[in-house]
Amino acid sequence: DVTWDKNIGNGKVFGTLGQNDDGLFGKAGFKQQFFNDDRGKFEGQAYGTRVLGPAGGTTNFGGRLDWSDKNANAALDISKQIGGRPNLSASGAGVWDFDKNTRLSAGGSLSTMGRGKPDVGVHAQFQHDF
């Protein structure tokens, strides 16, 4: 594989060319950090891929947003294969301390492929250490 990246302004252009069992592939994109301060850390990325194999080729493109702070995180990823349907994935989770022995953790996720029904997941835990 050949990988490269170059800093441009507040972001980075990246790319990879290589070969695997699916055939030849290339991936390129741009990643940028919007802020990293008391609001947390917020990053975004846009990318595209191309795979050439014995059965033909595929082209995908998408984007991703990630946010996190000391208590929580969230992510959103949207992608689409040319000729296909869009895919969406979103997740978030957090941990909040009430005192030194008590905390609440909770999170959830949503994922959908094309026009199908979305997969939804939620979880929560209340913990107290005696």
Swiss-Prot record:
Protein's UniProt name: Gloverin
Major location (coarse): secreted
Keyword NAD carried by entry: no
Pfam short name (any one): Gloverin
Source organism superkingdom: Eukaryota
A biological process term (GO) from this entry: defense response to bacterium
GO cellular component: extracellular region
